[in-house]
Regions:
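Short alpha-helical "recognition helix" segments of helix-turn-helix
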Residues: 36-39, 69
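Residues that mark the N-terminal boundary/hinge immediately upstream of a DNA-recognition element
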Residues: 22, 33, 62-65, 76
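Short C-terminal boundary/hinge segments that cap the last helix of small helical domains
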Residues: 63, 72-84
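Residues within the alpha-helical elements of helix-turn-helix
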Residues: 29, 40, 72
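Short, basic-rich loop-to-helix N-cap that marks the start of a DNA-contacting helix
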Residues: 31, 56-71
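Conserved hydrophobic/aromatic packing and binding residues within compact polymer-binding modules
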Residues: 23, 37-38, 49-53, 80
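Recognition helix of helix-turn-helix/homeodomain-like DNA-binding domains
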Residues: 42-59
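A short, Lys/Arg-rich alpha-helix, primarily the initiator
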Residues: 2-29
Length: 84
């Protein structure tokens, strides 16, 4: 029998926020602006990066974002999952 997941919506929201904080921290450490990162992953506006980093308007990074951001920042995608 397969175990049911015990993560609540609040748990998942905390995970999204942690990932956003980690992306922001690493981006800032690398000296890359939100605009430059947005353009590097194929977006024309900082809104996607800004909202996802702060988990605003129910926005969060998806796996495609994270793969592209890791590539642009030159880090391993697992670095975004620290402290989860």
């Amino acid at each position: 029998m397969i175990k049911n997941s015990e993560f609540s919506k609040d748990d998942i929201q905390r995970i999204y926020k942690t990932i956003g904080k980690n992306v922001k921290r690493i981006r800032e450490e690398k000296g890359i602006s939100q605009l430059n990162l947005a353009m590097a992953i194929g977006h024309k506006s900082v809104g996607v990066i800004s909202n996802c980093e702060l988990c605003l308007q129910n926005k969060h990074f998806n796996i495609e974002h994270l793969v592209k951001i890791a590539d642009v920042l030159g880090v391993n995608i697992k670095d975004f999952f620290g402290n989860i």
